[in-house]
Amino acid sequence: MPMHFIFSDEAVLLFDFWRVHSPTGMALSVLVVLLLAVLYEGIKVGKAKLLHKTLESLPATNSQQFILGPDQDSTGSRSTSDNRTRLRWFLCYFGQSLVHVIQVVIGYFVMLAVMSYNTWIFLGVVLGSAVGYYLAYPLLNMT
Protein backbone atom coordinates (compact mmCIF):
# COMPACT_ATOMS: atom_id res chain seq x y z
CA MET A 1 0.00 0.00 0.00
CA PRO A 2 1.49 3.35 -0.99
CA MET A 3 2.03 5.97 1.67
CA HIS A 4 1.46 8.85 -0.71
CA PHE A 5 -1.52 9.94 -2.80
CA ILE A 6 -1.83 8.29 -6.19
CA PHE A 7 -4.23 8.58 -9.11
CA SER A 8 -5.45 5.05 -9.71
CA ASP A 9 -8.64 3.26 -10.67
CA GLU A 10 -7.77 0.33 -8.41
CA ALA A 11 -8.23 0.37 -4.65
CA VAL A 12 -9.57 -1.53 -1.67
CA LEU A 13 -11.88 0.69 0.36
CA LEU A 14 -12.93 0.07 3.97
CA PHE A 15 -13.63 -3.65 3.55
CA ASP A 16 -12.00 -6.46 1.59
CA PHE A 17 -15.15 -6.96 -0.49
CA TRP A 18 -15.06 -3.32 -1.67
CA ARG A 19 -12.39 -3.79 -4.32
CA VAL A 20 -12.30 -1.34 -7.20
CA HIS A 21 -10.76 -2.53 -10.47
CA SER A 22 -12.18 -0.22 -13.14
CA PRO A 23 -12.79 3.45 -13.84
CA THR A 24 -16.54 2.87 -13.53
CA GLY A 25 -16.08 1.21 -10.15
CA MET A 26 -13.89 4.10 -9.02
CA ALA A 27 -16.49 6.64 -10.15
CA LEU A 28 -19.19 4.80 -8.19
CA SER A 29 -16.92 4.55 -5.15
CA VAL A 30 -16.17 8.27 -5.31
CA LEU A 31 -19.91 8.92 -5.49
CA VAL A 32 -20.55 6.74 -2.42
CA VAL A 33 -17.80 8.45 -0.44
CA LEU A 34 -19.04 11.85 -1.59
CA LEU A 35 -22.53 11.00 -0.33
CA LEU A 36 -21.10 9.81 3.00
CA ALA A 37 -19.32 13.15 3.39
CA VAL A 38 -22.55 15.03 2.56
CA LEU A 39 -24.40 12.89 5.11
CA TYR A 40 -21.73 13.63 7.72
CA GLU A 41 -22.20 17.38 7.26
CA GLY A 42 -25.98 16.97 7.35
CA ILE A 43 -25.81 15.06 10.61
CA LYS A 44 -23.67 17.81 12.16
CA VAL A 45 -26.35 20.36 11.34
CA GLY A 46 -29.11 17.99 12.43
CA LYS A 47 -27.50 17.61 15.85
CA ALA A 48 -27.31 21.37 16.31
CA LYS A 49 -30.95 21.81 15.23
CA LEU A 50 -32.06 19.02 17.56
CA LEU A 51 -30.34 20.64 20.53
CA HIS A 52 -31.80 24.04 19.64
CA LYS A 53 -35.34 22.62 19.34
CA THR A 54 -34.95 20.74 22.61
CA LEU A 55 -33.86 23.86 24.47
CA GLU A 56 -36.66 25.91 22.88
CA SER A 57 -39.32 23.39 23.88
CA LEU A 58 -38.31 23.43 27.53
CA PRO A 59 -39.26 26.32 29.81
CA ALA A 60 -36.38 28.77 30.19
CA THR A 61 -35.79 28.02 33.85
CA ASN A 62 -35.76 24.26 33.25
CA SER A 63 -33.44 24.41 30.25
CA GLN A 64 -31.01 26.59 32.19
CA GLN A 65 -31.25 24.26 35.17
CA PHE A 66 -30.45 21.20 33.05
CA ILE A 67 -27.48 22.93 31.47
CA LEU A 68 -26.09 24.59 34.59
CA GLY A 69 -27.17 21.95 37.10
CA PRO A 70 -29.64 22.15 39.98
CA ASP A 71 -29.52 24.97 42.50
CA GLN A 72 -27.86 24.38 45.84
CA ASP A 73 -30.95 25.39 47.82
CA SER A 74 -33.44 23.20 45.97
CA THR A 75 -35.45 20.78 48.04
CA GLY A 76 -35.69 17.12 47.16
CA SER A 77 -39.32 17.27 46.02
CA ARG A 78 -40.11 17.44 42.32
CA SER A 79 -43.50 17.95 40.73
CA THR A 80 -44.98 15.63 38.11
CA SER A 81 -44.43 18.18 35.36
CA ASP A 82 -40.80 18.46 36.44
CA ASN A 83 -40.44 14.69 36.14
CA ARG A 84 -42.03 14.73 32.67
CA THR A 85 -39.67 17.50 31.64
CA ARG A 86 -36.71 15.51 32.92
CA LEU A 87 -37.89 12.41 31.05
CA ARG A 88 -38.32 14.40 27.84
CA TRP A 89 -34.87 15.93 28.31
CA PHE A 90 -33.39 12.46 28.90
CA LEU A 91 -35.03 11.07 25.75
CA CYS A 92 -33.78 13.99 23.68
CA TYR A 93 -30.31 13.58 25.14
CA PHE A 94 -30.39 9.84 24.41
CA GLY A 95 -31.45 10.57 20.82
CA GLN A 96 -28.63 13.07 20.46
CA SER A 97 -26.19 10.47 21.75
CA LEU A 98 -27.35 7.97 19.14
CA VAL A 99 -27.03 10.57 16.39
CA HIS A 100 -23.53 11.36 17.67
CA VAL A 101 -22.53 7.68 17.47
CA ILE A 102 -23.79 7.53 13.88
CA GLN A 103 -21.83 10.69 13.07
CA VAL A 104 -18.64 9.24 14.57
CA VAL A 105 -19.01 5.98 12.63
CA ILE A 106 -19.57 7.82 9.35
CA GLY A 107 -16.64 10.12 10.13
CA TYR A 108 -14.31 7.18 10.69
CA PHE A 109 -15.50 5.51 7.49
CA VAL A 110 -14.73 8.69 5.57
CA MET A 111 -11.34 8.97 7.27
CA LEU A 112 -10.46 5.36 6.44
CA ALA A 113 -11.52 5.89 2.84
CA VAL A 114 -9.11 8.83 2.60
CA MET A 115 -6.41 6.63 4.12
CA SER A 116 -6.55 4.47 1.00
CA TYR A 117 -4.36 7.28 -0.37
CA ASN A 118 -6.35 7.34 -3.58
CA THR A 119 -6.55 10.89 -4.89
CA TRP A 120 -9.96 10.35 -6.48
CA ILE A 121 -11.43 9.20 -3.18
CA PHE A 122 -9.81 12.14 -1.39
CA LEU A 123 -11.27 14.59 -3.91
CA GLY A 124 -14.68 12.93 -3.47
CA VAL A 125 -14.50 13.49 0.29
CA VAL A 126 -13.44 17.13 -0.12
CA LEU A 127 -16.18 17.79 -2.68
CA GLY A 128 -18.75 15.96 -0.53
CA SER A 129 -17.82 18.03 2.51
CA ALA A 130 -18.12 21.22 0.49
CA VAL A 131 -21.49 20.23 -0.98
CA GLY A 132 -22.75 19.08 2.42
CA TYR A 133 -21.70 22.34 4.04
CA TYR A 134 -23.27 24.34 1.22
CA LEU A 135 -26.58 22.46 1.47
CA ALA A 136 -26.86 21.95 5.23
CA TYR A 137 -25.59 25.06 6.96
CA PRO A 138 -28.25 27.44 5.61
CA LEU A 139 -30.76 25.18 7.39
CA LEU A 140 -29.34 26.33 10.74
CA ASN A 141 -30.82 29.80 10.22
CA MET A 142 -34.27 28.47 9.33
CA THR A 143 -36.76 28.20 12.17
Curated annotation (Swiss-Prot):
GO MF term list: copper ion transmembrane transporter activity
Keywords from the named record: Copper, Copper transport, Cytoplasmic vesicle, Endosome, Ion transport, Lysosome, Membrane, Phosphoprotein, Transmembrane, Transmembrane helix, Transport, Ubl conjugation
Top-level taxon in the UniProt lineage: Eukaryota
Cytoplasmic topological segments: 44-93, 141-143
Transmembrane intervals: 23-43, 94-114, 120-140
Post-translational modification note: Ubiquitinated; ubiquitination and the subsequent proteasomal degradation are prevent by SLC31A1 that stabilizes it.
InterPro entries from the UniProt entry: Cop_transporter
Residues where Phosphoserine is found: S77
Keyword Phosphoprotein found: yes
Family indicated by similarity: Belongs to the copper transporter (Ctr) (TC 1.A.56) family. SLC31A subfamily.
Protein known as: Protein SLC31A2
